[in-house]
Amino acid sequence: MSKTEVRLRQPIVVVLGHVDHGKTTLLDKIRGTAVVKKEPGEMTQEVGASFVPSSVIEKVAQPLKGIIPVKLEIPGLLFIDTPGHELFSNLRRRGGSVADIAILVVDITEGFQKQTIESIEILKDKKVPFLVAANKIDRIPGWRPIENETFTKSFRSQSQSVQKALDNYVYKLVMQLAEMGFNAERFDRVRDFTRYVSIVPVSGKTGEGLPELLALLAGLTQQYLKTRLRAVEGPAKGVILEVKEEQGLGHTIDVIIYDGILRKSDTIVLGGINGVIVTKIRNILLPAPLQDMRMTRSGYRSIDEISAAAGVKISAPGLEEALAGSPLYVANDEAKLQEARKLIEEELSKVRFSKNSTGIVVKADSLGSLESLVAGFEKIGIPVRVADIGPITKRDLIEAELSAKEVEEYGIIAAFRVKPIPGLDTSKVKIIYNDIIYQLIDDTIKYIEDLRERRKRRTLDSLVLPGKIKILPGYVFRRSDPAIVGVEVLGGVVRPKYPLIREDGQRVGEVLAIQDNKKNIERATKGMEVSMSIKGNIMIGRQVQEGDVLYTDVPQEDLEILFKNYKDSITEDMMEVIKELIKIKKAENPLYGIFIQ
């Protein structure tokens, strides 16, 4: 490299994708390949990340020289060790993400699933470029695996039918990406990498396609992200991935440094549960090599300084309340300290808030997850009253109860990886727990929708009540469309819009209207003989015969509400109908009416 050339830092790479699509397997294979190909002293294990040096990438990509020219200016690639949404949400920086590029892992045989689509939405929102690893090619029927081979060579050795099957799978991914607004193509058919998302068929299990994946990651980042990757000599900037208590070290923070140089003598500024934390670094730590483990009781070795991009553990006083997802700035003079303090205060107030308005309470364990949850709820129109970090407190319960007084379904707490403080009575407030961001949002939506639905059905008139009728022989006025018949009510209640079933549980239609002495009536009870029109899948003489007995089709939820809120309204004859209904409905739902003693 000439003196005029700019030094580049290593790009930070994250791995996202749907559960069970092979994110961890692929990451493990990349790390394993790097270990096998490295020379002594070439590879450094970092905290929360794995650095794959350019020398290793060049060796792995050697067979592709004729197809992908690989002459790397970047020092290598820094892979964040933990894949998935939850950790990615903590890789926050102003205007986007600390991640420079992402690998979106998709099971080639399954295509896009819910979390795949969510991953793309997140990457789009954070403006992170990505390429698609179409994983599990070894699962394509008839695929003959060749361990650690390039995709190009392995693909050529497959039968024509297998090649065609793979192309069809890739085409489906192309179509799914097009639906989300992206041009995409298999990597070896892409001419303009700025306009097309590259799809790299790989196997995390056999290592096939890994050379192309690594070569593309390295090549694309150094070609198109040069300005972003320009190495900065100034004070370090980073983001806190995790806060941990380590034996012999106390509270520590795992940090990704994405800019500048971090030194052991530095003063750092970061976000804490109760505001900004200013502290002086005690130690910058990296994992000790295996042979040095005996020398360090903690399993870490101390270093004097490190340049971006890097994953390190920092030991310092006062880190007990440090927040995962918080920015971290080096500030060694008063002016820098005030500037950093202001930036972090702005970040904290943007994500943590309390409004005097109706909405749910959201509690999370980190700034990143809290930010993702609030954005997720607001996107689907669920307002947030309180967004905060840490365990659930009495104040949170009070806020939820205040919300419930205004809008019943908003009197809840959505809790991500946090629990109530010990001894807190939470019995009066619904708390929804989940350790997966998208699942917590889904669970909350379901609870709110169910509550709204239940509220609609609270009045007795809105319920389908138990009823039993008999079609009177000789009183068929019209056989179908709608059928009009004379009926006797044998028990319970029948109303217009009530669905009807036969004694075998088969749905036959819905009551359209009821007449008594040629006048429309809203209900018919035991002992009444009325004329009834029934619409739906019914023809007298085919699905239903004269003399047949029909029942109202009472949903399980309506029966529960009837017993819970309106038990006094249940007459003896209605109770008999309920018992008969339970016998009929249990054939398809063994739990139907289980709550009735």
From Swiss-Prot:
Q: Where is this region: G4?
A: 135-138
Looking at the UniProt record for this protein, which Gene Ontology cellular component terms does it annotate, in alphabetical order? Answer: cytoplasm
Q: Which UniProt keywords apply?
A: GTP-binding, Initiation factor, Nucleotide-binding, Protein biosynthesis
**Which Pfam family, any one, appears in the UniProt record?**
IF-2
Where is the segment annotated G3? 81-84
Which portions of the sequence form the region G1? 17-24
UniProt-listed InterPro entries:
EFTU-type, P-loop_NTPase, Small_GTP-bd, T_Tr_GTP-bd_dom, TF_aIF-2_arc, TIF_IF2, TIF_IF2_dom3, TIF_IF2_dom3_sf
UniProt keyword annotation of GTP-binding present:
yes
Residue span of region G2:
42-46
Q: Keyword Repeat, does the record have it? A: no
Which annotated residues bind GTP?
A: 17-24, 81-85, 135-138
- One MF term in GO for this entry? GTPase activity
- Segments carrying the region annotation (G5) are 203-205
CDD domains in UniProt = aeIF5B_II, IF2_aeIF5B_IV, IF2_eIF5B
Domain tr-type G, by residue range, is: 8-225
The record's family statement is: Belongs to the TRAFAC class translation factor GTPase superfamily. Classic translation factor GTPase family. IF-2 subfamily.
Question: What role does this protein play?
Answer: Function in general translation initiation by promoting the binding of the formylmethionine-tRNA to ribosomes. Seems to function along with eIF-2.
Q: Which PANTHER family match?
A: EUKARYOTIC TRANSLATION INITIATION FACTOR 5B (PTHR43381:SF4), TRANSLATION INITIATION FACTOR IF-2-RELATED (PTHR43381)
Q: Name it.
A: Probable translation initiation factor IF-2
